[in-house]
């Protein structure tokens, strides 16, 4: 389904039915389609402190479905201790576009990387520098961990509304994943319908750059699709979905009024994409001895103690010249 764009006081609102203002003075929702999946990269390696837009000329970004999905379960509360625990990597995003400044959410998952939605990065129109990130933002006057400017964008190769954003270090040469501890990703082996979850981000119907948490339950789970019964609004795009262990199980994208909100579920395909593109991303089971991806697992082919590793001097492979028993 495609959204209709209606002009309201020189601002644009994307919705399937009616134009709805969704924030302080002039915040609106924007929809967009996924573009190509190729990385967009700039040449800069160090950034200036990003300019922070304030006031009412901010427009929340939301997916092509609907901007505001307030369900009967509207259990939303503000997080004021934003630098504590799993809240710290939750990030306020601004995208400076020709049509205005748009707001969204994301979550830091690596030394210099963050996850958000494809439709959020589409608002940059190919210019990564247009996207600014403020991890742990408290309000529009309080950014305890400063701001960072994007330098590269990589979109998920599948259908899911997911994108990776890489950032330049700040003026102190600190990376975004050094000023906050990156979030832990769930392996989702035990994730199922009816489990309690939270979605944490920066909704556009609340004061600018304030973090809010919504509580609810998973109602549907299949492939990369996850649905839940909690409420969100424009600006929540890219918010992390946490399980009860405070691990990220998905990335919120939007919803359908009176029905559900939804996220890209981190299933095996998504997990493989993330591991291929984010070297230091951490999944909850990575440290388990039996995890084949754990470098200390003796069965991991990259483990130097694995008898089948060609670099192991005890490997009887004929090609290992360091093994005296090799033919």
Curated annotation (Swiss-Prot):
Recorded name of the encoding gene: sspA
EC number: 3.4.21.19
Leading EC class: hydrolase
Post-translational changes noted in the entry: Proteolytically cleaved by aureolysin (aur). This cleavage leads to the activation of SspA.
UniProt organism field: Staphylococcus aureus (strain MW2)
Composition skew (Low complexity), residue ranges: 40-54, 286-327
Keywords recorded for this protein, A-Z: Hydrolase, Protease, Repeat, Secreted, Serine protease, Signal, Virulence, Zymogen
GO MF, any single term: serine-type endopeptidase activity
Name by which UniProt lists this protein: Glutamyl endopeptidase
Site feature location: Cleavage: 68-69
């Amino acid at each position: 389904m495609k959204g209709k764009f209606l002009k309201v006081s020189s601002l644009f609102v994307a919705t399937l039915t009616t134009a709805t203002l969704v924030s302080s003075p002039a915040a609106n929702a924007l929809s967009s389609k996924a573009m190509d999946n190729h990385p967009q990269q700039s040449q800069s390696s160090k950034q200036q402190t990003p300019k922070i837009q304030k006031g009412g000329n901010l427009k929340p970004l939301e997916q092509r479905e609907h901007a505001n999905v307030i369900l009967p379960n509207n259990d939303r509360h503000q997080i004021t201790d934003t630098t504590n625990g799993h809240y710290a990597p939750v990030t306020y995003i601004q995208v400076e576009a020709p049509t205005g400044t748009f707001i969204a959410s994301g979550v830091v998952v690596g030394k210099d990387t963050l996850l958000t939605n494809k439709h959020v990065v589409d608002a940059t129109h190919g210019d990564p520098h247009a996207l600014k990130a403020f991890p742990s933002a408290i309000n529009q006057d309080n950014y305890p961990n400063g701001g960072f400017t994007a330098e590269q964008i990589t979109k998920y190769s599948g259908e899911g509304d997911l994108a990776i954003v890489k950032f330049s270090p700040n003026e102190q040469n600190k990376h975004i994943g050094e000023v906050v501890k990156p979030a832990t990703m769930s392996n989702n082996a035990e994730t199922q319908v009816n489990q309690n979850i939270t979605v944490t981000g920066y909704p556009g119907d609340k004061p600018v750059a304030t973090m809010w948490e919504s509580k609810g339950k998973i109602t549907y789970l299949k492939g990369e699709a996850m649905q839940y019964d909690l409420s969100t609004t424009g600006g929540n795009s890219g918010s992390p979905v946490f399980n009860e262990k405070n691990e990220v199980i998905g990335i919120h994208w939007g919803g359908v009024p009176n029905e559900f909100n939804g996220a890209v579920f981190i299933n095996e395909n998504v997990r493989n994409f993330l591991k291929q593109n984010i070297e230091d991303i951490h999944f909850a089971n990575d440290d388990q001895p039996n995890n084949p991806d754990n470098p200390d697992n003796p069965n991991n082919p990259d483990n130097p103690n694995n008898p089948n590793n060609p670099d192991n001097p005890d490997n009887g492979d004929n090609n290992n010249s360091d093994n005296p028993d090799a033919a």
